[in-house]
């Protein structure tokens, strides 16, 4: 595994892991308690201008409907546990060797090799490129058809606050709700504030999105910071006084622009395949950026297991796209609009999903959360292997 960072100073905030992704993590023996994961039992969409609840049960009965809870987890805690599972000697398969401070500067899809910044050339049976929204690997796949990611007009601020800071303040103590995610809207969809706990409900995570932030001096680096007073300056225009009191506690605020790209027609070429933001960058409105990358990893893990002949790789990658590309493309479309998602956007997403109707928010949640990438991948592989056995036996 080639990683351009040092992995020594990981930063970030929390993310949500919806049932479609949590089933994968649990299958990998991720232990929620070891990462301080919070099972989110309730969710609501609230008019942030007057604090009226618009949709009280946005994620109602997650466990009974989809068999698994929705989790919130600090991304550093999740990364730490995933890295341990990948590199430790215990467990199935060979431990992964992580080569840090190695930035890839060029890809060769046909030769299955990469060149790093220091001139080192590395070869493999298959390159799995997870190089983000500004992927350079995507040009190897699409050639001159490549479409660069661009500004969306949206920017976001993120911060974390210890729960005790709210509980010790009479003005905010009553607003703390364990195991709950809340989405506050502003007038005209100009902004949104997402609030949920992480780290065993001991830390509150905030994501403030808007098209009205001054982004003239803001880049895409999520490590960039602004003064803690900046979120409140905007919140005074967007939200009710009660919510302003919450935003006032912001500290160590990170601020960056959000970029996106529409769906692309293919995710692989020769012996190079795109995953994650390199394949399907999306905004945060469905909370599926990380979840879709997890689905990518799960599908590839199953489809490439016990491949002993390079000649099998192409067929397996075609299966990967069959399982993942239309779904990832639909999620891109659904994710790039402030919820609740309008019917026109649901219709555009449904064009990628033959046999599925997305007539309501409930339809969207049902499609997104009920999908079992593990079962889909195993079933597709079983069909392929059955055909291969029949062919080898001489019946075809």
From Swiss-Prot:
- Database matches in Gene3D superfamilies: FAD/NAD(P)-binding domain (3.50.50.60)
User: Which SUPFAM superfamilies does this one have?
Assistant: FAD/NAD(P)-binding domain (SSF51905)
The enzyme's first-digit EC class, named in words, is oxidoreductase
Q: Report the EC number(s), separated by commas if there are several.
A: 1.-.-.-
List, alphabetically, the Pfam families matched.
FAD_binding_3
**Catalytic center at which residues?**
158, 196
UniProt key word Flavoprotein: yes
Keyword line: FAD, Flavoprotein, Monooxygenase, Oxidoreductase, Virulence
Name the family: Belongs to the paxM FAD-dependent monooxygenase family.
What job does the chain carry out? FAD-dependent monooxygenase; part of the gene cluster that mediates the biosynthesis of the phomopsins, a group of hexapeptide mycotoxins which infects lupins and causes lupinosis disease in livestock. The role of phomE' within the phomopsins biosynthesis pathway has still to be determined. The pathway starts with the processing of the precursor phomA by several endopeptidases including kexin proteases as well as the cluster-specific S41 family peptidase phomP1 and the oligopeptidase phomG to produce 10 identical copies of the hexapeptide Tyr-Val-Ile-Pro-Ile-Asp.
Q: How does it assemble?
A: Monomer.
- PANTHER family attached here? FAD-BINDING DOMAIN-CONTAINING PROTEIN-RELATED (PTHR13789:SF215), MONOOXYGENASE (PTHR13789)
* Name listed for the protein in its UniProt record: FAD-dependent monooxygenase phomE'
- Biological source species: Diaporthe leptostromiformis
